[in-house]
């Protein structure tokens, strides 16, 4: 394979010190040699979805830019916390805007989900709600291996903003390797 797979990360957290942000920032450093991982812009500036705004003003430039970067990528890694047993509102809002575009950026797109939390189950409930949403968008979600980073605060270095726990790094590296193989399998 001569060209690297282009993978983008979509961060579901808006918080500056986000543990999930730390996971996402670690991914480019541990990606297999056949893959390049780049972060998508923050979803913080995307306005709340409003069909009236869409009809009267069209799609926000932030949404159009996000969609184009997703379209250009070979795959998307969604890295997100779990809020109240589900998907964070900011991430759901970004997905709602993306779902309204005529040229669906996530349709047929390989997607990997990673969740982390300070609790022991690592955002598991969010993963399953997110999978339900992505079914509607016709995204191709990789089922296994899953990453649910429990007690993540003990596995990162807040000074460097990266994952430092070797077991977690090994799991994430293995998952990215599997995602690269998944992308190759489902590419049309």
UniProtKB/Swiss-Prot annotation:
SUPFAM superfamilies per record: Flavoproteins (SSF52218)
Outcome recorded upon mutating residue 85 to N: Improves chromate reductase activity compared to the wild-type enzyme
Outcome of mutating residue 128 to N: Improves chromate reductase activity compared to the wild-type enzyme. Increase of the affinity binding and catalytic efficiency for both chromate and uranyl
Pfam families tied to this protein: FMN_red (PF03358)
GO terms (BP aspect): protein homotetramerization; xenobiotic metabolic process
UniProt keyword annotation of Cell wall biogenesis/degradation present: no
Activity's thermal dependence: Optimum temperature is 35 degrees Celsius.
Keyword Oxidoreductase found: yes
Binding of FMN, residues: 13-20, 82-85, 117
InterPro entries: Flavoprotein-like_sf, FMN_Rdtase-like_dom, NAD(P)H-dep_reductase
Deletion phenotype: Cells lacking this gene show an increased sensitivity to chromate.
One Gene Ontology term of the molecular function aspect: identical protein binding
Entry keywords, A to Z: Flavoprotein, FMN, NAD, NADP, Oxidoreductase
GO CC entries: cytosol
Induction comment from the UniProt entry of this chain: Induced by both chromate and the stationary phase.
Catalytic activity: a quinone + NADH + H(+) = a quinol + NAD(+); a quinone + NADPH + H(+) = a quinol + NADP(+); Cr(6+) + 2 NADH + O2 = Cr(3+) + superoxide + 2 NAD(+) + 2 H(+); Cr(6+) + 2 NADPH + O2 = Cr(3+) + superoxide + 2 NADP(+) + 2 H(+)
EC code(s) of this entry: 1.6.5.2, 1.6.-.-
Subunit structure: Homotetramer. Dimer of dimers. The tetrameric configuration has a central role in chromate reductase activity.
Function: Catalyzes the reduction of quinones. Acts by simultaneous two-electron transfer, avoiding formation of highly reactive semiquinone intermediates and producing quinols that promote tolerance of H(2)O(2). Quinone reduction is probably the primary biological role of ChrR. Can also reduce toxic chromate to insoluble and less toxic Cr(3+). Catalyzes the transfer of three electrons to Cr(6+) producing Cr(3+) and one electron to molecular oxygen without producing the toxic Cr(5+) species and only producing a minimal amount of reactive oxygen species (ROS).
Protein name: Quinone reductase
Gene: chrR
